[in-house]
């Protein structure tokens, strides 16, 4: 899997989380942040995450639903939940969770 950093004035971060426990909403108390820039990855019993950060964006690491694409705009995180298929065609509409 690959994730790319989008260079904007909003300091956007995005990546992909894969979870071993599907359909679990991230409690706000379970979110972990890292301030380390560059490519990151995390592996644990809860699943794994991989993505890219810009210099000052926090990194969102945690459980979501199945595969999730997440965006970080400063201190506001938005998680787009989707179920990945063998191809990216005909993806379902993405429910948005903001917390």
From Swiss-Prot:
Subcellular location field: Mitochondrion
Main localization, broad class: mitochondrion
UniProt KW Mitochondrion keyword: yes
GO CC terms, sorted: mitochondrion
Keywords from the UniProt entry: Mitochondrion
Protein name stated in the entry: Uncharacterized mitochondrial protein ymf23
Encoding gene (name): YMF23
């Amino acid at each position: 899997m690959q994730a790319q950093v989008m260079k904007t004035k909003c300091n956007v971060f995005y990546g992909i989380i894969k979870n071993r426990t599907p359909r679990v909403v991230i409690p706000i108390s379970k979110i972990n942040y890292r301030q380390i820039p560059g490519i990151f990855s995390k592996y644990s019993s809860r699943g794994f995450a991989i993505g890219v950060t810009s210099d000052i964006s926090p990194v969102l690491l945690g459980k979501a639903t199945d595969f999730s694409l997440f965006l970080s705009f400063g201190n506001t995180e938005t998680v787009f939940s989707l179920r990945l298929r063998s191809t990216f065609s005909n993806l379902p509409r993405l429910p948005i969770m903001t917390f």
